[in-house]
Amino acid sequence: MSCMGAAVNIITTDGPSGRAGFTASAVCSVTDTPPTLLVCLNRGASVWPVFNENRTLCVNTLSAGQEPLSNLFGGKTPMEHRFAAARWQTGVTGCPQLEEALVSFDCRISQVVSVGTHDILFCAIEAIHRHTTPYGLVWFDRSYHALMRPAC
């Protein structure tokens, strides 16, 4: 699977069960009518209960140069330190939106399908916030790669 390049995303939530976030590349568009994304989340992950109970999330697609933030959200760093490392806005669902992301998709989880060790979260997009940073970041062959031309 390391040969499948993918955008790097930080998935965030905030709600009754608290604030949490993790790095994910297993994210993709499902349909534009209605606008829907999917996010894959391991049920064994420490953040799984928070996302499962809050039922909202924001997909923050990272820009070139945000590798350190991706690594921070992909590790065992306490949540308060993860969120303190960047500037955030609050989206319409109450989820944190990364100010310097390429784009943020504010979503409600509309359906969950379990496959093996993971849940596939189908996410109905409530709002989209495009940022001014034009260069994307992808994960390919177990390393980061900056897109050298504007992504959008």
Curated annotation (Swiss-Prot):
UniProt key word Transcription regulation: no
Alphabetical keyword list: Flavoprotein, FMN, NAD, Oxidoreductase
Record keyword Flavoprotein present: yes
Cleavable signal peptide: none
GO process annotations (BP): nitrogen utilization; uracil catabolic process
Function: Catalyzes the reduction of FMN to FMNH2 which is used to reduce pyrimidine by RutA via the Rut pathway.
Family, per entry: Belongs to the non-flavoprotein flavin reductase family. RutF subfamily.
Protein name according to UniProt: FMN reductase (NADH) RutF
Organism: Shigella sonnei (strain Ss046)
Source species taxonomy: Bacteria, Pseudomonadati, Pseudomonadota, Gammaproteobacteria, Enterobacterales
Gene designation: rutF
